[in-house]
Amino acid sequence: MKIEKIKLPIYHGTLIVIKTKKMSKVAAKYDLKNCDDCDAITFVRSNKKGIKKYFVAFENAKPSIIAHETVHVVNYIYQHHCIELDRFNDEPQAYLTGFIFDEIYKSLNKKNGNKQQ
């Protein structure tokens, strides 16, 4: 299991990207239920000061799965900051989605020995 921590600007907190060969190891480490058959999972923990850690764990890191988990991360961030999604002014959401996707993608590819931008 490989883990990378990425600081989140503006919204604070940390994005934690996990690449694993067996999701059951992630489930055991973080006491997660019902994720042994998952290709990926997103979950949140808070430290003692209430700062959020957004975890994204991947057994299968296809772009469509990264995109799927990115939606969960963005929604968690919006929920924790009491921000309502706005279909008519979605630029902040679009920028955050792009940022989260790029950070996950770079992290997962770096762990595979590739340096992709």
Segments from the language model and where they lie:
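Active-site scaffold of zinc-dependent metalloenzymes
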Residues: 13-61, 73-77
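Short, flexible coil/linker elements and helix-boundary hinge sites characteristic
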Residues: 31, 59, 80-82, 109, ...
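Post-HExxH zinc-binding segment in Zn-dependent metallohydrolases
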Residues: 85-117
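Catalytic Zn2+-binding segment of zinc metalloproteases
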Residues: 70-87
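A general marker of short, structured functional hotspots
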Residues: 7, 26, 39, 50-51, ...
